[in-house]
């Protein structure tokens, strides 16, 4: 009977010890938090509010239930947003802007107090649309293409300055897409068609002019040739014409001789045989 009481007492003490260890382990686990690489933590204290210091990478202690860590990713990340803006000549353009951003580490407690964890979603689209509309309004629609480097530079400078007011650093800014409204696109297409028609008409005129010049040169050559033949005939009589006729007949005969499918039939009534019906 005494051994049973000892066993029960031992098990009771063991259970109490296990419970105590469990409570201690839970308390210890609640007192630790880890900040991974490329991250920073901001502590919120229930009595003092947001603490001014920023906690770096590693495992750290806190007061359970009184302090809460909030983790920020401080690595450079991309953010893309679109904006529909009006140009100086009252055309609508669609622009897509990509920025690479990161928070200013020393100002993370203030960012948490004013903007929270999703600071980029609250700030970047707003200031991006504001800057794009302000810059695009200074250019005509066609200038956005011909002067694109200048437009990008103005957007970059204005957006970097505006983002710093919210403690956000921008490492890179690029206009990735630009498209015009349907009305302007039709006008550009009509202009291109008109330019192509003008080039085609210019080509037709140039071709006709070249053909006219060729006809004049050809007529002058034929006139000179006729004059030379006339002069030669006047000096040598009809002999030159007979010579040209003989040369032409010789060329025809040579051509016929090379063709196996052509038979030569002499003129006259006797055909191939020298027959005289009168004899």
Curated annotation (Swiss-Prot):
Annotated function: Prohibitin probably acts as a holdase/unfoldase for the stabilization of newly synthesized mitochondrial proteins.
Induction: Transcripts levels decrease upon imbibition but remains stable at the protein level.
Expression across tissues: Mostly expressed in proliferative tissues, including vasculature, shoot and root apical tissues. Accumulates in dry seeds.
Designated name of the protein: Prohibitin-4, mitochondrial
Membrane spanning stretches: 7-28
Family: Belongs to the prohibitin family.
GO CC, any one term: mitochondrion
Cysteine pairings via disulfide bonds: none
Intracellular or extracellular location(s): Mitochondrion inner membrane
Domain of life: Eukaryota
Organism: Arabidopsis thaliana
SUPFAM superfamilies: Band 7/SPFH domain
Mitochondrial matrix side, ranges: 2-6
Topology with respect to the bilayer: Single-pass type II membrane protein
Residues with N-acetylglycine modification: 2
InterPro entries (UniProt xref): Band_7 (IPR001107), Band_7/SPFH_dom_sf (IPR036013), Prohibitin (IPR000163)
Membrane topology (Mitochondrial intermembrane): 29-279
A UniProt-annotated Pfam family: Band_7
SMART domains according to UniProt: PHB
Keywords: Acetylation, Membrane, Mitochondrion, Mitochondrion inner membrane, Signal-anchor, Transmembrane, Transmembrane helix
Quaternary structure note: Component of a prohibitin multimeric complex in mitochondrial membranes.
């Amino acid at each position: 009977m005494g051994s049973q009481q000892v066993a029960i007492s031992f098990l009771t003490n063991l259970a109490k010890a296990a419970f105590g260890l469990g409570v201690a382990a839970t308390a210890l686990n609640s007192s630790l938090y880890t900040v991974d690489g490329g991250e920073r933590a901001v502590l919120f204290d229930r009595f003092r509010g947001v603490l001014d210091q920023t906690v770096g990478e590693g495992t750290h202690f806190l007061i359970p239930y009184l302090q809460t860590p909030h983790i920020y990713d401080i690595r450079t990340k991309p953010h893309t947003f679109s904006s529909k803006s009006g140009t100086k000549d009252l055309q609508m353009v669609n622009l897509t802007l990509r920025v690479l951003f990161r928070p200013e580490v020393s100002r993370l407690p203030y960012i948490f107090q004013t903007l929270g964890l999703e600071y980029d979603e609250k700030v970047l689209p707003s200031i991006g649309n504001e800057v794009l509309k302000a810059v695009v309004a200074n250019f005509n629609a066609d200038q956005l293409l011909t002067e694109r480097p200048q437009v990008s530079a103005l957007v970059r400078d204005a957006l970097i300055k505006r983002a710093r007011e919210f403690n956000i650093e921008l490492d890179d800014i690029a206009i990735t897409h630009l498209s015009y409204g349907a009305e302007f696109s039709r006008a550009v297409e009509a202009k291109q068609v008109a330019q192509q028609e003008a080039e085609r008409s210019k080509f037709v005129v140039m071709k006709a002019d070249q053909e006219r010049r060729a006809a004049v040169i050809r007529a002058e050559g034929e006139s000179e040739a006729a004059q030379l033949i006339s002069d030669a005939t006047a000096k040598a009589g009809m002999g030159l014409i007979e010579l040209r006729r003989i040369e032409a007949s010789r060329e025809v005969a040579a051509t016929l001789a090379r063709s196996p499918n052509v038979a030569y039939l002499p003129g006259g009534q006797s055909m191939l045989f020298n027959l005289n019906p009168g004899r």
